[in-house]
Amino acid sequence: MIALKPNAVRTFRQVQHCSFRICRYQSTKSNKCLTPLQEYDRLVKLGKLRDDTYQRGIISSLGDLYDSLVKYVPPVVKTPNAVDQVGGWLNGLKSVFSRGKPKNIGAYVDVSKIGNSIPRGVYLYGDVGCGKTMLMDLFYTTIPNHLTKKRIHFHQFMQYVHKRSHEIVREQNLKELGDAKGKEIDTVPFLAAEIANNSHVLCFDEFQVTDVADAMILRRLMTALLSDDYGVVLFATSNRHPDELYINGVQRQSFIPCIELIKHRTKVIFLNSPTDYRKIPRPVSSVYYFPSDTSIKYASKECKTRRETHIKEWYNYFAQASHTDDSTDSHTVHKTFYDYPLTIWGREFKVPKCTPPRVAQFTFKQLCGEPLAAGDYLTLAKNFEAFIVTDIPYLSIYVRDEVRRFITFLDAVYDSGGKLATTGAADFSSLFVEPEQILNDFELRPTTKEPDSVDTGMVDEMVEKHGFSKEIAKKSQMFALDEERFAFARALSRLSQMSSTDWVTKPTY
């Protein structure tokens, strides 16, 4: 294995921050003019990707969508009149029983009567590690430059939808609505218009629906966006076939028309690659520090010195600015803030140490010991490119809330392409133990007890169905619920990927 030293890639980061600073979640126009297959061949030639016959076939099928986009002229979408949208969500109910005007945005539609004026998008589904996200990201870079585009993780998109809905209500001047003053405004038409104008091509990563509120607003929003009037082209990745979205959900029958519309507006492709790309050996960098020598205790002076050195090196590396100051003989300049105020959903959140927007540093207790939610972690991931998390203790099912928060944080950082460096009691595959094994946060009790037997059937299922390694699948068995087991196993898989040289040195989106 090759250990990546911070100084070894310092020059790359300086060049990277000078020349490549694109926010992943804002609409942008592509500067590329290559087809998806040409871009794939280019990356293979550079050694960035392995040539895979199966994936090459999938990419070839994306050529039809690319050709359609080259010739596509999206419709002009006008911002709706606030007066016409008074009545809020009740308008959606009225539309089910009435054919009258004004036309309701996002009402039920008969897919058999929909035209073909919009290019048919792609819905790519398959197991973890089969390359779905890579294929979508590759296609995203080749979208013709006359079209706007947005690439976003689905959870973050729904966070945006809910937050933007509240903002739209505040922005509308109800004083000018006459008799409608004080009444609720239907925000879906405003959202649909904004998204359609900023995202002619909308790319969702990890499309999934688990919440009834999300399902109902998504039904109306997608019905509008995928209509001829709005003309948005959808590219989505998911672990599930469209027919399995929101399965067993509350009021699912109301969501089925949305599923049918997605199937009509996209080409559904099952990605069943024989290669799990997360299992391909990569050089591991030294971003995660733990006492590799069992004779050295975490609280010892020697270990403390090593931890502090590790943190300092990686903080300075992540914090490199995108410019230099001539007065300092071209040394990198950056400023460190303590208790830095960050506004999250209208409240102030203090980051213990950071160099915005490069890096933020927390102890594990500060990050996961407090009652933070997904929205908090998504905001952090949006505002910082890298994170350092120190003093990660041994964890067990007795601190399930902290484990869940850490997994939620990790998902947010991973989905934004962020970097991570840590210090902890042990390597991540050994951090999660049985409660009786823990002596204190950073020490285990001496034991000669044989490990508990695991359900080999469940282990085999996770290996075969989801593509996890057998070691990761075994570790996940300490959790009782299937959802927890899957989330834990995915977290270990992602942590391994995030420790690779490729991940640490890739441009931050």
Curated annotation (Swiss-Prot):
Binding site for ATP: G126, D127, V128, G129, C130, G131, K132, T133
GO CC list: cytoplasm; mitochondrial inner membrane; mitochondrion
Annotated protein name in UniProt: Protein AFG1
One Gene Ontology term of the molecular function aspect: ATP binding
GO biological process, one term: protein quality control for misfolded or incompletely synthesized proteins
Pfam families attached to this UniProt entry: AFG1_ATPase
Taxonomy, superkingdom: Eukaryota
Assigned keywords, A-Z: ATP-binding, Nucleotide-binding
Matches recorded under SUPFAM superfamilies: P-loop containing nucleoside triphosphate hydrolases
Keyword Chloroplast attached: no
Biological source species: Saccharomyces cerevisiae (strain ATCC 204508 / S288c) (Baker's yeast)
Family per record: Belongs to the AFG1 ATPase family.
PANTHER family: AFG1-LIKE ATPASE (PTHR12169:SF6), ATPASE N2B (PTHR12169)
Keyword Ribonucleoprotein among record annotations: no
Note: Present with 3570 molecules/cell in log phase SD medium.
InterPro entries reported for this sequence: ATPase_AFG1-like, P-loop_NTPase
